[in-house]
Amino acid sequence: MPEEIATLAGGCFWCTEAAFKLLRGVLEVVPGYAGGHVPHPTYEEVCTGTTGHREAVQVRFDPGVLPYADLLRYFFAVHDPTSEDRQGPDVGPQYSPAIFYHSEEQKRVAEAVMRELAPLYPKPIATKLLPFTTFYPAEAYHRDYFARHPEAPYCRLVIAPKLEKARKAFKSLLRP
């Protein structure tokens, strides 16, 4: 089965990147900026909230090992899908959650997973389902941020607890 790409915005890309690196079947995770109207934005530009980009990750995965539907179920567990412009302590349109679909099949699967999970939340799902347009990889200093800075306050207080929750809830999807 050929590899696939998923582009997902779930708040801070340091968190999302670290979370997806735990999964078997994931071949690569690249943090960056999805959507938007400014070509090749910088982190500083995206942080102004005026470029239209979301912090996101591109996940290259083997759907024979990790089906897209399971990847999306995991995605919904590692971000707050009911919050429009906030994920934990991070506030602004650049943290707005979204699934950027790369094909009609990805769109169909995402719609089905969203319908399946909607009753589990006390509020409507705010995560947007959008066609993929652009993705710009983040600057090198953002890549593998959690792995390189596990003792940084944000990593200890925000990312580590999120990863622990994911490890407990999704043992069957994790790398050995």
Curated annotation (Swiss-Prot):
Under the heading Gene3D superfamilies, the entry gives: Peptide methionine sulphoxide reductase MsrA (3.30.1060.10)
Supply the EC number(s): 1.8.4.11
Task: Tell me which Pfam families the record gives.
Answer: PMSR
Swiss-Prot/TrEMBL catalytic activity? L-methionyl-[protein] + [thioredoxin]-disulfide + H2O = L-methionyl-(S)-S-oxide-[protein] + [thioredoxin]-dithiol; [thioredoxin]-disulfide + L-methionine + H2O = L-methionine (S)-S-oxide + [thioredoxin]-dithiol
Active site, UniProt feature? C12
Keywords in alphabetical order: Oxidoreductase, Plasmid
Q: What class of enzyme is it?
A: oxidoreductase
Q: Name one GO molecular function term.
A: L-methionine:thioredoxin-disulfide S-oxidoreductase activity
* GO annotation terms (biological process): protein modification process
Which family does the record claim for this protein?
Answer: Belongs to the MsrA Met sulfoxide reductase family.
Q: What does this protein do?
A: Has an important function as a repair enzyme for proteins that have been inactivated by oxidation. Catalyzes the reversible oxidation-reduction of methionine sulfoxide in proteins to methionine.
- The name under which this protein is listed is Peptide methionine sulfoxide reductase MsrA
Q: What is the lineage of its organism?
A: Bacteria, Thermotogati, Deinococcota, Deinococci, Thermales
The UniProt gene name for this protein comes to msrA
